[in-house]
């Protein structure tokens, strides 16, 4: 058990689906965090109404409303679940007040963070970017391969239910691909990365599916790669219980005589690793098919919990 004084107060900026799901996770599961404020701009939003019913302090006046709340001085960590454009302004205001920011938008002001890969390197960063839903699902796999064999090229395809993609996701499609591609390289360890997102209109909606392709050396050890991948899947599932391999890891060897076509004008020999994932949401607030949103809120919560725990330990 943890005493109340061991917990750090958090604010959630953005009272939409992601912000509301994150609030419920903090209230249900957090050991080192407590809700300090839910911040929105729509007084009629379900997220603000739900927060009030749960006894959480609220404001419908955005970042300006947050800094004038009586308990703002107690806020140590803020989650931004708005948009990349809005985050730049929010980050500047919160930085002035010494509040650590966990950014769930593609703004990428701070370092990219995937909890199982590089969180401990950034515990003291003032602003941490959680990449994207596709990044949180696939970068651990790229890293799992790259830690045992060099990854020359990695490509990920994130397929999400169209119904789970709100206006923020749709408005940030370009940022999604750019941010995820960059993080595949800088966090995942691939020499080159590419990201594709697919909005699946199927009804009933399908769960999030992710495909990861990695090209490594032709002589790479398949047993070592598969063992590393399975260990990584278990690590991610420790904070995203619905994260799992959909089928066995697949390997295809391409020789100089029969190279793999990466692009129209590029062919390479090597070992192609194909990993197929499924992410089922916890259905705390969002439907279970919205694993793309659940993995973001779960990763953000895991990051904040570790940051808060490190402060308590200090």
Curated annotation (Swiss-Prot):
It comes from the Bacteria. SMART domains: Semialdhyde_dh. Coiled coil: none annotated. The active site is at residue 133. InterPro entries: Acetaldehyde_dehydrogenase (IPR003361), Acetylaldehyde_DH_C (IPR015426), NAD(P)-bd_dom_sf (IPR036291), Semialdehyde_DH_NAD-bd (IPR000534). It catalyses: acetaldehyde + NAD(+) + CoA = acetyl-CoA + NADH + H(+). Keywords: Aromatic hydrocarbons catabolism, NAD, Oxidoreductase. Gene3D superfamilies: Dihydrodipicolinate Reductase, domain 2 (3.30.360.10), NAD(P)-binding Rossmann-like Domain (3.40.50.720). One of its GO terms (molecular function) is NAD binding. CDD domains: ALDH_C. Its EC number is 1.2.1.10. This is Acetaldehyde dehydrogenase.
